Amino acid sequence: MTGKLHQLGPQTKIFLVIKAKKTLTPEFIKQQIGRAFRDLLGSLAVPSLAMPASVRGALGGADNQSAVASAMVHFGVTEADLKKVMAAALEKGGDYADLYFEHTFNNNVVLMDGKVNNCGANIDFGMGVRVLAGDQTGYAYVEGVTMEEMLRAARTAARIASSGKAGKSVGLTEKTIAKSRYAVTEPWEDVSVKAKIPYLEKLNEKIFSLDNRVRKVQASLSDSTSHVLFCNSEGVSYYDYRPMVSFMAVCIMEENGKMENGYAGRSYRKGFEFMTDDIVDIIAREAVDKTAILFKAVKPKGGEMPVVMGAGGSGILLHEAIGHAFEADFNRKRTSIFCDLLGKKVCDEHINVVDDGTIAFNRGAVNFDDEGVEGQKTYIVKEGILTSYLHDRISAKHYGVAPTGNGRRDTFRNTPIPRMRATYMEAGNMKEADIISTVKKGIYCDQFTNGQVQIGAGDFTFFVKSGYLIEDGKLTQPVKDINIIGNGPKALADITMVANNDKIDNGTWTCGKDGQSCPVTCGMPSALVSKLTVGGES
C-alpha cells in the first residue's frame, strides 16, 4: 500500500487563502488557485510567484546591490513612490518613519493513518507604516500596495503620532550583508506538493519499522517563504528573503493496553535541500525513543531538590523564565525584575547568556531585524554580569544605546517589539557526568513541553515530559509528567555548575508575546540548579 500513500484521501482538507485585498486582480487570484491545485496534482510549481532570479542570485552574497531594486519591481513600487509615502508619514511631525512590505507563502502537508488528510496553502501580502514622534507610535497597515492605500496608511499613522511640525526623510541607501545567513539552493516556491509527500511517507514508514508497539503516526511538513522590503526615513533600505521549514512527527505507542505519545521535529531557515533521508532517520528515531522511554517512567515524589537541566531542550526554561525579562520593553516599563540590575551581578561568574541572530540557517537567525538593524550576537549576561537588554529602536533610544537587532514583528500587520532570536547559555568547563555525580538525590530533566511565566515576578511553572531520577550521583529510574516550579532570576542565581556540552535545540520553537508569534530557538549545556521545587507524587 505504500505506493498509494501520496494519494489524497476522502477526508483531505485543502485550503488556499490569499490575503491581499484590492491590488490582486481576478487574473492573479485565478493564477494562484490554479497553481495550488496543480501542485496538489503533482506538477512543478509555477515560478511566477517567486522573487526574480536577480534577487535570488544575490542571496548567496555574491551581488546584493540589485536586491532592493528588484524587490521594488516585485511589489510594484518605485523609489519615488516610497519617498512620497514617507513624506506623507512625516507630514504631521514625526521624528521617524518606516515602511515594511511583506509577501509570504505558507504551505502545510499532514500525513495521518498513511494518507494525506490536510493540505493547506496561504498567501499573505501587504505593507505597514510606522511613525514615531517622541513617545508616541502610530501604525497602520494595508493589504495592498496601491498608492491610494499606502498614502491612507501613512496618513493614519501620522495622525496617531503627531507633533505638529513636518519631519524630513533622506534618500534611500541600500543596506547589504556580505553573505545571507540562510541562502537556499532549492527555494520552496519551486517545490510541488508531490515532491514533498515521499518524505512524509518515509518518516511514517520508518517510525513504524523501528518499534512494533507503534500504533499511529502523524507526520507533517510546513514550509514558508517571506519576501521583505524595508525602508525608513533615515535612508536605510534592504530586502530580505526568509525561508523556513518545519518537519515533525507525533508517535503513539501501545504496551499492554497502555498508551504513550512522543514528538520530534526540526526547523531551520532552509529550502528543499533540507529534506534528506538522514533527517527522516533522525526525527523517526527521536520520536520513537522519546515515546518508548515513557513506558518505563514513573512519577517521582515531589519536593525541593537539586535539578540537572539536560543539554539542548532545557534552554526553553532559559528562554521563558529568564529571557523575556531581559527584553528591554519590559525593563523600560519597569515590569521586569531585572529593570534595576543592568551592570550588576545576577549569577555566578562562569555563566554567559547570549541572544544570537547570526547562526547560519538557525530558526531564529536574521539577516536584518524588522527595523533595518543587522543581526548580531548580543551578550545579555557576561561572566555573571547583566551587560545588555534586548533592544528595538524605541528602547535603545530610551537607554541611549544602539539597537541590538531584536526589533521583530509577526507580520506587516504588527509593530516591531523586542523579541529573542536564538537564546542560549554558553558552555562551561565541567563534564555532565561529573555534575550528576555531585547530586545525592535529585531530578535530571530531559524533555520540556509547555510552561507559564510571570514576567514581573519571574515565577514559573514548567511541565517536564521525561527525565530521570538522580540517586547517589547516578541516573536511575526514568520519570515523567512532573512540574518544575521556581523563580527565573533565583534559578539563574542558583546555577552552580555548567557542563561543556553546549547544544542548540533546533526544534519547532515559536514564541508568543503581545499577540505576536516569532520563530526562535534556544539551548544550553547541562547545568545544575542547586534547588527547585519538583511537583510529583505526594
Residue ranges and their predicted role:
Residues 3-538:
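N-terminal small-residue-enriched
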